[in-house]
């Protein structure tokens, strides 16, 4: 059984978010939370919040035991880019791309759900 949580349009670049997601992928939920609390990156609190939401979804929607849950999938896709301009010398301007992320975390208890024929 799986439960999922998604945070959309987070104002942190996906490349930076993926650094932290790589640390928790495949880990036990409790271990992943401990790692996130000790990781000194701007995306850590946001990812922790998404993970807690996935655990709450698992417990509330599917009656799963949160002690047995494992982070099955954790990925960050690119969201909409905010385009800004920085003034430069001699009247020119440079483009600045402020990137956003869609963060998805899927937790699983390792048991397969019965498929209907």
Curated annotation (Swiss-Prot):
Which top-rank group of organisms is this from? Bacteria
Q: Which Pfam families does this UniProt record tie to the protein?
A: Ribosomal_L22
BP GO annotations: translation
Q: What GO terms fall under cellular component here?
A: cytosolic large ribosomal subunit
Please state which protein family the record places this protein in.
Belongs to the universal ribosomal protein uL22 family.
Against PANTHER family, the record matches this protein to:
CHLOROPLAST 50S RIBOSOMAL PROTEIN L22-RELATED (PTHR13501), LARGE RIBOSOMAL SUBUNIT PROTEIN UL22M (PTHR13501:SF8)
Protein name (Swiss-Prot/TrEMBL): Large ribosomal subunit protein uL22
What is the gene name? rplV
């Amino acid at each position: 059984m799986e439960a999922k949580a998604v945070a959309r349009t987070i104002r942190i670049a996906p490349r930076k978010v993926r650094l932290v997601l790589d640390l928790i992928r495949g880990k036990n939920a409790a271990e992943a939370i401990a790692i996130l609390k000790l990781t000194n990156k701007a995306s850590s609190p946001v990812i922790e919040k998404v993970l807690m939401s996935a655990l709450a979804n698992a417990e509330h929607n599917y009656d799963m035991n949160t002690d047995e849950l494992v982070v099955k999938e954790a990925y960050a896709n690119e969201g909409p880019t905010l385009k800004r301009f920085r003034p430069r010398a001699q009247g020119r301007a440079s483009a600045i791309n402020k990137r956003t992320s869609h963060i998805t975390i899927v937790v699983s208890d390792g048991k397969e759900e019965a498929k209907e024929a």
